[in-house]
Amino acid sequence: MAQQRALPQSKETLLQSYNKRLKDDIKSIMDNFTEIIKTAKIEDETQVSRATQGEQDNYEMHVRAANIVRAGESLMKLVSDLKQFLILNDFPSVNEAIDQRNQQLRTLQEECDRKLITLRDEISIDLYELEEEYYSSSSSLCEANDLPLCEAYGRLDLDTDSADGLSAPLLASPEPSAGPLQVAAPAHSHAGGPGPTEHA
């Protein structure tokens, strides 16, 4: 049986083998069940004692019950094989299922795209309103200071530079303890001779 399954088989041959297995298993169940019913019937006196006949009937019932169980397991295996056959070979159904799934995914994608577009528009509107509010508040602050913000920062930089320039000569001036400043006398040229000497 394993060698037959290993051989390459066409679909028709495989289906025929499934059909034969189904008929054989059902026939086995029916025959064994019928024989069990017949064995349960009380017969007339025979040459065999009743005790021996009872043991023989008991053993026969066990064997036929095992045959019924074996046929049932074979039917369950047949159902599993049929499912596998349909999954692997029923290409139209598989393609239809794939198409339905693709359609569902496309619908879901379109819905997500619509929601994202709506969310983008709402965020754009909110961002525009926030920018207007921000720039209007900034312009009101500049008008309150009578200067634009850029000019205020520029004037602040100029004041800082001028303060640094004034501090440099103050650092170079002499200390008060150095004494009085000496004033140089202007030189006068006298043609007639030396004049009076000026004392500082």
UniProtKB/Swiss-Prot annotation:
Pfam families: Med22 (PF06179). Residues 166-200 are annotated as: Disordered. One of its GO terms (molecular function) is transcription coregulator activity. The keyword Nucleus applies. Keywords: Activator, Coiled coil, Nucleus, Transcription, Transcription regulation. The keyword Transcription regulation applies. Its main location: nucleus. Residues 93-122 form a coiled coil. One of its GO terms (cellular component) is nucleoplasm. It is found in: Nucleus. GO terms for biological process: positive regulation of transcription elongation by RNA polymerase II; positive regulation of transcription initiation by RNA polymerase II; RNA polymerase II preinitiation complex assembly. Belongs to the Mediator complex subunit 22 family. Component of the Mediator complex, a coactivator involved in the regulated transcription of nearly all RNA polymerase II-dependent genes. Mediator functions as a bridge to convey information from gene-specific regulatory proteins to the basal RNA polymerase II transcription machinery. Mediator is recruited to promoters by direct interactions with regulatory proteins and serves as a scaffold for the assembly of a functional preinitiation complex with RNA polymerase II and the general transcription factors. Component of the Mediator complex, which is composed of MED1, MED4, MED6, MED7, MED8, MED9, MED10, MED11, MED12, MED13, MED13L, MED14, MED15, MED16, MED17, MED18, MED19, MED20, MED21, MED22, MED23, MED24, MED25, MED26, MED27, MED29, MED30, MED31, CCNC, CDK8 and CDC2L6/CDK11. The MED12, MED13, CCNC and CDK8 subunits form a distinct module termed the CDK8 module. Mediator containing the CDK8 module is less active than Mediator lacking this module in supporting transcriptional activation. This is Mediator of RNA polymerase II transcription subunit 22.
